[in-house]
Amino acid sequence: MKPGGFWPHLALLGVSLPAVLGWMDQGASRSPNMVPGESQAEETRGFEVTRREGLPSPGLSASCGKKLCSHGSRCLLNRTTGQPSCQCLEVCRPRYMPVCGSDGRLYGNHCELRRAACLLGKRIVSVHSKDCFLKGDMCTMAGYARLKNVLLALQSRRQPLPQGTPRQSLASQKRLLVESLFKDLDADGNGHLGSLELAQYVLKEQDMDGSLNRCSPSDLLRFDDYNSDGSLTLGEFYTAFQVIQLSLAPEDKVSVTTVTVGLSTVLTCAIRGDLRPPIIWKRNGLTLSFLGLEDINDFGEDGSLYITKVTTVHMGNYTCHALGHEQLVQTHVLQVNVPPVIRVYPETQAQEPGVAASLRCHAEGIPLPRIIWLKNGMDVSTQMSKQLSLLANGSELHIGSVRYEDTGAYTCIAKNEVGVDEDISSLFIEDSARKTLANILWREEGLSVGNMFYVFAEDGIVVIHPVDCEVQRRLKPTEKIFMSYEEICPRVEGDATQPCQWASAVNVRNRYIYVAQPALNRVLVVDVQAQKVLQSIGVDPLPVKLSYDKSHDQVWVLSWGDMHKSQPSLQVITEASTGQGQHLIRTPFAGVDNFFIPPTNLIINHIRFGFIFNKTDPAVHKVDLETLMALKTISLRHYGCMPQAMAHTHLGGYFFVQCQQDTPTSTGPQLLIDSVTDSVLGPNSDITGTPHVSPDGRFIVSVSNKGPWLHVQEVTVRGEIQTLYDLKINPGISDLAFQHSFTEGSQYNAYATLDKEPDLLFLELSTGKMGRLKNLKEPPRGPAPTWGGPRRVLRDSGLFGQYLLTPAQESLFLVNGRQNALRCEVSGIKGAATVVWVGEV
């Protein structure tokens, strides 16, 4: 570093620099208790000392011999002109003889006082006042902070960033500035700043600020020499200026953590650095620290994220960064493994020799389980033949022609990396002459009440068995309700006919069906076992929507109040599966326009929360299904979204919200809500329409009866939503149903009714392969259903069912999904408003 180049251009700070090595005149060693009159003599001797100290060589003596320099300076030859000139002393010798200056500051010795006077270009003399001695070194923390800001400001003016330098973060710019300042101060380039080097840095008067409070660069050693070795390293210099050096190994940029559902896990942030600021954790861009989540917290001092009980909703991406350093981010991908959960069908069956028999096993888990079959404990894969085969990735065991020796207990075993599950399907082979009681019960009683479609039409309730393709039972409008002896559909005075009006219906554990009769302000309870209407429950006027909360055994009832929907209400029927003795509870929610209760599945068997929508409020309201109390409001106002429908997938915990259309002919956009944080993530890409989620939570199909597009998305094992494809469908979709694939054990297919055409749409979700089933009759005509719902309903037949049912104008059509073909038409049934499938009882 050049003497007289950088340092003389800086200003003197409030307190004196510590005593450092330099030129010292004789007067500097004098006692501060100087008597009056000694100042002039002292100044004369100072000239003489300066002249002698400026004669290091004979050549210089000739040039500076007649050049007199004042205190605090010495004679030097100008390198350009060769002429002698007086320049301020660079440093003073390290001798501590404190002296008060006439400027009110305390100096380490007389040399430093005179050097400061030289640098500042003003007269400063020693005084005998004790004030500055009593004040001592008054560098406060506030002044020290101000000093560091002044040093950085001066450095930025001295060495500005070159033009064209890319704009960087403030933290990065500050780091470069501090590095530059350290390099300039490190005169000997040894990577350590000593007291001598810091003492050379003085500030000019115009750069001084009263708020510095007597602080000097030497105070860097006093405050930030952490190892007390008398020097500052670059690391200590970084710390002094609060420049944090953080690092993240390239291999840690993305960290994948796999944990089994139900366990706890800890995500540790791999960002390292001395004095690292607090770690901030985010999920889907939302900070987790202040949300008060019951199952996630980051209170650990090590900056880790703790998830106390992992479920599939927790899967997805989590990020961590140090506070104020958002440019350095680590991503944690949380994958959740789920042990297999299986169901077999049928649990027991009896067949006669020579007929075909199938045993089916459905398994869900993450990763996808592998299925094997045992017969009486022996692996059947070693017995494969033309008569015995495994279909759909082993999920179906098919016997082409059964024999007596095929009788046995067939065990389905599903395995994946984290667990195993098994169940037994029993097969009995007996001829008709040797029927056992169990055989008779299975064949006759079982088929008489279970595995049926219950159709609610204008002329009553029709029970249809899909295998026989015939009506098993018909409950006419004049049938009596068992407990009240009222008619199912009483005749209105003056009407010649007695049509039934139905709205919504739900299956309650394959025991009862609850169905709404809006015009009669009641809900009927149908006993599946007896195939009779058991009772009626009076509810608020115009009940139009029912939903069964299986987790709490409750049926929720939404009523309009009147045809203008001006007095809507939400009621709950408790203990629904008992069939009688239920209680009707009125909820406290006003202005309800719609509600949503997520369905259960094999993996998620308990639901805690539901959601309600208000007529004029751009928000969804989270409700505790057990206490029936509102918990939280999730505002959609920022997106101008009035919610119309919702769907949910447990994979990643996403809610899909359909917003109302802007115009009668447009389709409503969708928003995504994260169920972990109850926060809106934003639009679901450019997806529009009503969302439908497959039973396993993997596929999301969005359709509309007004728009031409069908969108298919998939949730990956990492909890990420990706769009698979978009299909253009004309006209729009009326209703949609899912059916388990009969060729791929882990896949689902979708069927959809068209709003204005008789065809039935078929879609293989994983591949996008699409087809149409034709030869169906015209769909129901006329205006949209009075009580809401699709114009042309479509109902599947459960997890193992292969049939679907949809109405035409005056008939019903049954479709065999396994063969992807029309099964039959059941004529003479008009105005089918809703359909319920009842599985095995």
From Swiss-Prot:
Glycosylation sites: 317
Binding site for Ca(2+) 2: 225, 227, 229, 231, 236
Occurrences of domain Ig-like (ranges): 250-336, 340-425
CDD domains recorded: Ig (cd00096), IgI_2_Follistatin_like (cd05736), KAZAL_FS (cd00104)
Domain EF-hand: from-to ranges: 173-208, 225-247
A cellular-component GO term for this protein: extracellular region
Gene responsible for this protein: Fstl4
Residue ranges occupied by any Kazal-like domain in the UniProt entry: 80-134
Name this polypeptide is given: Follistatin-related protein 4
PROSITE patterns for the chain: EF_HAND_1, EF_HAND_2, IG_LIKE, KAZAL_2
Origin species: Mus musculus (Mouse)
Compositional bias per record (Basic and acidic residues), positions renumbered to this chain: 42-54
GO molecular function: brain-derived neurotrophic factor binding; calcium ion binding
Region (Disordered), start-end ranges: 29-54
One of the protein's GO biological processes: negative regulation of brain-derived neurotrophic factor receptor signaling pathway
Keywords of the record: Calcium, Disulfide bond, Glycoprotein, Immunoglobulin domain, Metal-binding, Repeat, Secreted, Signal
Disulfide bridge positions per record: 86-118, 92-111, 100-132, 269-320, 361-412
